[in-house]
């Protein structure tokens, strides 16, 4: 699965400051990651979920779930990296609205082909002529708290979609907190869903 966050540029500093305040309150200074969710930080992760939900449609999450059994590598020149960036394009393209300007920050990835991000930016710009893609850059997740929060939300969605949650665990509690706040289970959504969109892509076509 691939995930992303969407937020107005004007809220970026405010949200980062609020997360910093939560870190101080809970003495939680390590990298925020789904794989690091633990019982002794449960309240911290609960409050991160609450913070995300509190902004409504001004702070959104979207992910694409790909069924590996349907993925035909031959359609991507037998290049898994190329296939990844095609899905990355689909993830971002449907969030770009006319007459807006966008900056895209990606988690740093060791690419065999160094042109992946410039080509992604070019494809997004050509497909959205009435919008401006001013920047597409990679940053190390350990230094970018919003990329870390995206990892947390992606892990929650992935664990529910893939059926890997174990009852009674802190991860299950975090997912339940998110589902309660959204007032629905984490499951594939309609295309129009704004707040927490889970796109289970059908590689044969259709939503």
Model regions and ranges:
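Phosphate-ester processing/binding pockets and catalytic centers
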Residues: 1-207
């Amino acid at each position: 699965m691939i995930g992303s966050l969407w937020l107005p540029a004007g809220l970026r500093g405010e949200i980062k400051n609020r997360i910093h305040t939560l870190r101080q309150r809970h003495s939680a200074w390590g990298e925020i990651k789904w794989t690091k969710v633990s019982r002794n930080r449960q309240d911290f992760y609960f409050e991160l979920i609450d913070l995300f939900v509190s902004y409504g449609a001004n702070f959104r999450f979207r992910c694409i779930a790909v069924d590996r059994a349907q993925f035909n590598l031959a359609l991507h020149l037998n290049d898994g990296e190329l296939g990844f960036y095609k899905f990355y394009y689909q993830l971002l393209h449907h969030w770009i609205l006319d007459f807006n300007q966008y900056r895209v920050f990606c988690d740093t990835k060791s690419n065999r082909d160094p042109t992946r991000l410039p080509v992604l930016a070019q494809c997004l710009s050509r497909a959205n002529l009435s919008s401006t893609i001013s920047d597409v850059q990679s940053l190390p997740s350990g230094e970018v708290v919003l990329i870390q929060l995206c990892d947390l939300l992606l892990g929650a969605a992935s664990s529910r979609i893939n059926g890997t949650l174990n009852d009674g665990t802190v991860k299950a509690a975090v997912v339940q907190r998110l589902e309660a706040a959204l007032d629905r289970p984490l499951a594939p959504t309609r295309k129009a869903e704004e707040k927490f969109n889970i796109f289970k892509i059908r590689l044969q076509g259709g939503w």
